[in-house]
């Protein structure tokens, strides 16, 4: 958070109970479309995993290797352009009709997407050398690379979609993104089923078909939101695509100043999960396939606190923009409570009914899947242990982004994930012979450390803005 907080806002006195209740209602109203939008995004990947899983364990392992690497780079670039969200929220907090400010930010979000995606395309095209360097089997590395050569073209339209999604979220109108994402699920499922297995006259394309379906779906999502911004009277007045070619260097620099630490924070978190995939690959195909199933389930539940983290970014950002310290606290803690509460419930369900979740991704009646299923049950029980802290760190990070605090949280994430989580997981897995279980315990420890550190930093910010308001 910078030192420009203006505590000039004074709101009529409202009881604490009413304030908490009102903020909870607002968080839920804004949050559920964001949550289901996140789930829709996860469902696109989950649909591909379900289809590809029917092609065999080795093919699933190849897809996991490729998508894990792709998503690591995608998350980095997505984190960069997601700086659009707090910047717009703060601008609207200062002035509800900041048309020019909003337009400048969105345009530079598009510019940033183009700037970052070109070098990433080069890296993705040559990923086979990276996979072999990391010790993956040559046959799996080759299949993963073939998959990547179709999947990578989804990146640019997806980043454009993220820019517009951030715009709609900051405007507190996320229903449009939910509508587009929901339509994309059906489109991706139909396209994947058609191209992967060969229907409606198409030859079976396997992994290539999955990549083509994802690229087409990402393009559809961007075009859908772009159409709404161009046609809807509420958004058309921003002229987001007008004079697109004009540079705006001050705004571009500001976006990168906020967004680059966000991008690195996202990468530190997601890359530790990619490192876990690499370590699982060294243990064996069974561990890797079981990890693929368990991590997919955990990722789906994570979409809920991620949504409440986005709510926190918008609500905290707007309160920060208008200089209201009490609203900052209520907005942040309300989203925090909702995110952590949901993850606690999901952790209980993962322990009580793991086979229900696993059966979505594996045929439980196939004897060949029994070793994978048994190991996935164990991994899912361990995932339940870190559900609460995972939710806490996700929402706390969103709260801090609403204050434009991204650099120190980046360092906290680096320490927690790579200073604690990964080394501990590697030692437990390979030095103490715990295998995949040790890797999952390390992940839990890293998430817990980040959650504690970010929550402490948030509390310090609250103390600071309260002191400024009282001065």
From Swiss-Prot:
It is found in: Cell inner membrane. Pfam families: MatE. The keyword Kinase does not apply. Its main location: membrane. One of its GO terms (cellular component) is plasma membrane. NCBIfam families: matE. This is Probable multidrug resistance protein NorM.
